[in-house]
Amino acid sequence: MSMDLSQFHHQLSARFASKTAHASDVLTSDQVSFFEEYGYLAGVDLLDDDQVEMLRGDLAAIMHPEMSGDPRFYEYNFNESADPSKVLFHALGAWRVSRAFHDLIFLPRLTACFRQLLRGQPRFWHDQVFVKPAKDGAVVAWHQDYSYWTRTVP
């Protein structure tokens, strides 16, 4: 078995850190106010094109059917759709398998953004990867996650 990257609680390479400078205040006060009023924030550029391509490359490797037996995944479903002509890939544990997904959660610019929005230190709970191809993908039914994630404090 390959190395379980969850054993490392820091970035493992400069693939992300060197491309995005650390900033204590990534968001404007208007963006933070919008989040506090509406509960979401869209259109925040946190990754550059190279970082997105690294994630896409690692995603393609993760989605390879031979990965389905990798014990580092907490959950792995190549297709959760009831319709075999649709695609709904779903996996938990990508950060344990992929250096790009691992290093993403320790990206200083990303964690600084979370600190601003949460007004406190973020805590990584788990990762979840859904892939639903455009015009081809299945759907995830509307739901509220609070019934699943009932913790509001550590």
Place the predicted regions along the sequence by residue.
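Non-heme Fe(II)-dependent double-stranded beta-helix
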Residues: S2-Y38, V44-W142, Y146-W149
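Short, glycine/small-residue-enriched coil/turn segments at secondary-structure junctions
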Residues: R151-P154
